[in-house]
């Protein structure tokens, strides 16, 4: 609930209780957390290693406060996952958080600025989405769930053709 409190990789099962479809990994935040610079650098290395090594990684959800825009660390993360996005090895969903604090014009502007930033790493093959999101008023929650479900579905092996 409190931003910046995640200090480990936390895994959550998605899907039915007795037969999870996938795991959701919550990685430590690196912008807001009130911890030492050394800890933040250690987290960055953990995240970079995780994003680089996990071949089963289907996608990355990057949460950005649209009032602040993409931070330098966000841009570094995008550069890091860029090659995997370009060859469609992973997908990206950027959630512009705290959308309840934006009026319509500011929300539209934030979406356009995010799209402009993401255009720098986007290719025809990449699967990149961006949406306004608010946990408070549930804006974007259903759309995000649809995207995550589609990621899980894309991991399932194709059904054998009928004989």
Task: Annotate each language-model stretch with its function.
Residues 8-11, 26, 60, 129:
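Residue-level recognition of specific faces of alpha-helices
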Residues 101-163:
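Canonical P-loop GTPase G-domain recognition
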Residues 30-41, 100-103:
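Flexible beta-alpha connector loops of hexameric P-loop NTPases
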Residues 44-128:
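Conserved C-terminal guanine-recognition region of P-loop GTPase G domains, centered on the G4
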Residues 1-20, 49:
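Switch I (effector-binding) loop of TRAFAC-class P-loop GTPase G-domains
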Residues 20-32, 56-58:
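Short, basic/glycine-rich phosphate-binding loops at helix/coil junctions
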Residues 3, 28, 136:
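Adenine-nucleotide cofactor-binding loop residues
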Residues 26, 97, 134:
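Active-site glycine-centered loops adjacent to acidic/histidine catalytic or metal-binding residues
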